[in-house]
Amino acid sequence: MPIIIDKDLPARKVLQEENIFVMTKERAETQDIRALKIAILNLMPTKQETEAQLLRLIGNTPLQLDVHLLHMESHLSRNVAQEHLTSFYKTFRDIENEKFDGLIITGAPVETLSFEEVDYWEELKRIMEYSKTNVTSTLHICWGAQAGLYHHYGVQKYPLKEKMFGVFEHEVREQHVKLLQGFDELFFAPHSRHTEVRESDIRGVKELTLLANSEEAGVHLVIGPEGRQVFALGHSEYSCDTLKQEYERDRQKGLNIDVPKNYFKHNNPNEKPLVRWRSHGNLLFSNWLNYYVYQETPYVL
C-alpha cells in the first residue's frame, strides 16, 4: 500500500524509480480508508537523503501512511534550503494539538555534546513528552534513541575511544517479541556513532527490554512498555552507499577515520559495499508499523 506525500517532494521521484508505491493527498482523499498518520522528526542535516531512506522503508508495507515531516523550530538548518523546509516541513507548534499513530525521531550529528548543550534540546524534550500521550508508538534512531533513553529513563551515553563505524553482526536476545518477528537469530545492521549506551544500564531499568545487541557494536534494539517506545541504536535505514559517503566526507575533511568495518568487499574502499542489512531493515520497520502502530492505534485518534 502507498505512502501519502506531497507530489512535489524531491524524494518522490527517487521512490518512484525504485517502484515504491506513493500516492498524492488528492488521490488518497477519494479512498474510503483511514491512513495511518506518521510524523518524521528529521534531525539530520542531510534532510532529503534521510527522507528517502525512511520513506523507502515505511512505504514497503501493506499499510497506507499519511506522512508529516517535522523540523526543529529552535535550530537553524544550514545544509538544506529554507524553501524545502517551508514547502514540505512543519514545526512542533504546527502539530502539537494533533495526535499521530506513529512518530520517528532520527539521529543527529550532535552526540559529542551533552544533551543539554544541544541548541534544540528543550524543544525536543517537549516533543518527547508530547509523544507519551499523543502518539501510539515512537521509533527513536541512533542519537534520537540515546536522547529518548536519557529523557524517559535516565540512561546515560558514554564517549567511545574510536568511532563505531561499519556493519556489525547482532544477536536476537528475546525470541518472542513481535518487533523481531521473522528475524534470523543473527543479523546485520550499520552503526555510525562516537558514543554508546551500555547494556548494564539498559538492564538496570526494569521498564526496558534489550532485544538485540552485538559483541562488537553493543546495544542495538531496546523496547519500552507495550511497545510505546522503540529504540534502535544502529542505522537499519541506511542506503547502500551512506557509510561510503560518510567515510569519503571525513577523509576530505582530513579526519583520521578508519575504513568502515565489514562494509566494503575485502575491506577495500575501492570496491563495492556489501549490503547485508536491507532485508532486516525492512522487517524492523514493517514489524514496528504493523504490530505497534497499526494493531494498537484507535480508528479515531
Swiss-Prot record:
A Pfam family matched in the record: HTS
Site feature: Important for acyl-CoA specificity: E111
Record site: Important for substrate specificity: S192
Enzyme class: transferase
GO annotation, cellular component aspect: cytoplasm
Active-site residues annotated for this sequence: C142, H235, E237
EC assignment: 2.3.1.31
The reaction(s) this protein catalyses: L-homoserine + acetyl-CoA = O-acetyl-L-homoserine + CoA
Record-level Gene Ontology MF annotations: homoserine O-acetyltransferase activity; homoserine O-succinyltransferase activity
Stored SUPFAM superfamilies: Class I glutamine amidotransferase-like
Key words of the record: Acyltransferase, Amino-acid biosynthesis, Cytoplasm, Methionine biosynthesis, Transferase
Binding site for substrate: K163, S192, R249
Top-rank lineage group of the source organism: Bacteria
GO terms of biological process kind: L-methionine biosynthetic process from homoserine via O-succinyl-L-homoserine and cystathionine
Protein role: Transfers an acetyl group from acetyl-CoA to L-homoserine, forming acetyl-L-homoserine.
NCBIfam families: metA
UniProt-listed HAMAP family: MetA_acyltransf (MF_00295)
Family, similarity comment: Belongs to the MetA family.
Protein name: Homoserine O-acetyltransferase
Organism: Bacillus thuringiensis subsp. konkukian (strain 97-27)
